[in-house]
């Protein structure tokens, strides 16, 4: 995927609600959010209206940035 001008590898996860990326700097304002995973709850930064390109397909959506074992593309971007 290409996000914020940076090229990253990510997993397409149809079971994940949200798109969560490992620590990176994104432009714009963010707000704190808590998400639940297998290891319990994690505090992440929520960025809205971020342009993302997945295999040549462009979309704009909400991206969460925080401590995650892998970059995950969730249903919020897959359904667009």
Regions found by a protein language model. Give the residues of each.
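Aspartic protease
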Residues: 2-80
């Amino acid at each position: 995927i290409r996000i914020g001008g940076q090229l990253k590898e990510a997993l397409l996860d149809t079971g994940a609600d949200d798109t969560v990326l490992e620590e990176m700097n994104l432009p714009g304002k963010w707000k704190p959010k808590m998400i639940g995973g297998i290891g319990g709850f994690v505090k992440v930064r929520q960025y809205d209206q971020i342009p993302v390109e997945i295999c040549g397909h462009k979309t704009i959506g909400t991206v969460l940035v925080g401590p995650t074992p892998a970059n995950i593309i969730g249903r919020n971007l897959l359904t667009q």
